[in-house]
Amino acid sequence: MEYCKNFYQIKSNSEIFERIKAERKEVGYYNLPYQDTAEIKDYAQSISKKHIVVLGIGGSSLGARAVYEFLLPSNDYNKDLLFLVISKSGNTIETISIFKYLNSLVEIDSSNCTIISEAGSILTRLANDNNIKAFDLAENVGGRFSVFSVVGLVPLAMVGVDIDNLLNGCK
């Protein structure tokens, strides 16, 4: 393998190309723009709450917030809330702590809560045990790419963003 003075590879290397092709199959974010969004849109349409509270840290909340603030800013707040609890692992201490605290202030149940987490996580089990809507987050999608997964698409669809159009922009 040859490199120029700036460490750019001069010759093509089939091994590197094959690794990139293999990564495309293993890493989930490459396929996010092509996912089926029917369930997310149907669910978003069924929500009658006027406001949504997203509980999450890092990629579990920042991507959706950034897109929302850019596209649909609003300051109209009241108590007609839906708690959207997001944690990839389902046991993120900050998210769980906030969830428990809020549950001590207001009864959180299937009428005002949705959970997004990996299948089989503590949060997903809580959702299943309490008839709370849950979306499974793919294990192979990392936080920084999660805005184009259910982590970002569910809250964005709920506030009226055309998520199919958003995903088309990723293609």
Task: Label the predicted regions.
Residues 45-171:
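Glycine-rich phosphate-binding loops that contact phosphosugars or nucleotide phosphates
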